[in-house]
């Protein structure tokens, strides 16, 4: 598959019930990146996450098929990573002040 730029609608005009993301950095960092081969032989040395494992940590990042984890919404994962980076920067700034 080839794709250009992926753009997801994100204007406040389309949103309601907005609240802060409640995700811990430890939970985000517990996601385990892996290298794998596809069972159908179509691709080797793919990198990614296991949907069933991510579902236990952040179900909103997982696409379900017939109620079972099937895929990961990788574009939304970036929001979680930004949250973790901000958390880590806050900790780093605090340590620098010591």
Task: Show which residues each predicted segment covers.
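Alpha-helical coiled-coil heptad-register detector
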Residues: 77-80, 87
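C-terminal intramolecular chaperone/autoprocessing and neck/assembly modules of extracellular spikes
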Residues: 1-74, 88-98
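Active-site phosphate/pyrophosphate-handling residues
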Residues: 26, 80-83
